[in-house]
Amino acid sequence: MEIGYFAVGLGPTVAPELVRTVAITAERLGFSTIWAPEHVVLLDEYASKYPYSSGKFPAPADTPIADPFTTLAYAAACTSRIKLATGICLVPEHNPLVLAKTVATVDRLSGGRFILGVGVGWLAEEFEAIGVPFERRSQRTREYVEVMRKLWTEPRSSHQGEFVKFTSVASYPKPIDDNGVPVWFGGESNPALRRVAEYGDGWIGSNLLPDQAAEKISRIEELLKAKGRSRSDVKLAVSPYANPITADDLKRYRNGGVEEIGLWPRTEHDVIAGLEQIAREFVEPAAKM
């Protein structure tokens, strides 16, 4: 069982000394991954429903949320082992050729430690502000991931799809791994789980307790089998998010198929104290499992 840390580049951690200290400390304490979120803009008022908690995003619009790729590249320069992941990247808001280049660059600079955590988005008003249609964002995400994988693995790439068209382009540098960068999908709905089974390298479930996580994983396993894929083809991670858990819950998560738990600090102001608390309560017990 591995323990990851949510989230760098959010709120008080949007400061060079804190990004550096969090990254170095998390690596030293044995965390597996540091995760960085993404929102290009937030709004004071919106009609969209946040899929967790009360239905409202649990932070005001002026909460700092740094660009995750810049943040993780900075963290990469401060570390040598810990994995670096977007949690999550709103892929349909991006140009996939530009995003493929950004992801490959961060992966290359980190020595192959990057994971692209992907979400399709929930905040329609953010899409509208950026100028991207909210409708068909799932289909857009699928095509964008297909495009990025071509650009990461082929010397020259062509694509003629619904959203993207280009002929014989070269995108370098490539990621460290010849197969490209791992793509993990977030979400708990049936469409989200189908994305994992059909073309994901991993899953990031959120706001799930052990029994809930086990139920979702059982469904993923069914979908994988239907697609002719193996359970070992995907990595399964879960964040309890707002749900309080104890070290005793780690075994229940593991028995349900969870391989990594992503935890948020429970100290509001002292980020490093929160990291150290998570390490004592969860990283150390998880290492003994």
Spans of model-derived segments:
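Active-site-adjacent structural elements that line small-molecule/cofactor binding pockets in enzymes
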Residues: M1-M289
